[in-house]
């Protein structure tokens, strides 16, 4: 009985709040307030603005390295495998590829977006 009373009270309170919000008028509604918010961008500016290709390449590089780091996360659980030499070899190969690709990006100035 107590649970039913709590459930009905919460339902009635939710319905009352929904009815109140639908009946109250929208105050201060103007064009910019009714547009969706896009973090940091002016919603009234033109849509075709130039985009930094260097920043885009750094973002793609970050996504690739983030994916490789996600591949490294299950390595502690992989130590429990029966075929330990194969697991160690494959993990060292993955870490070597990650280090070499980071060195390549660094030498090619792919991580500097200020230039």
From Swiss-Prot:
Cross-referenced InterPro entries: NADH_UbQ/plastoQ_OxRdtase_su3, NDAH_ubi_oxred_su3_sf
Cellular compartments annotated: Mitochondrion inner membrane
Enzyme class: translocase
Superkingdom of this protein's organism: Eukaryota
Alphabetical list of Pfam families matching this protein: Oxidored_q4
Gene Ontology annotations for the cellular component aspect, listed alphabetically: mitochondrial inner membrane; respiratory chain complex I
Membrane disposition: Multi-pass membrane protein
Coiled-coil region: none
BP GO annotations: mitochondrial electron transport, NADH to ubiquinone
Described purpose of this protein according to its UniProt entry: Core subunit of the mitochondrial membrane respiratory chain NADH dehydrogenase (Complex I) which catalyzes electron transfer from NADH through the respiratory chain, using ubiquinone as an electron acceptor. Essential for the catalytic activity of complex I.
Self-association state and partner proteins as the record states: Core subunit of respiratory chain NADH dehydrogenase (Complex I) which is composed of 45 different subunits. Interacts with TMEM186. Interacts with TMEM242.
Family: Belongs to the complex I subunit 3 family.
Identification of the protein by name: NADH-ubiquinone oxidoreductase chain 3
Originating species: Pan troglodytes (Chimpanzee)
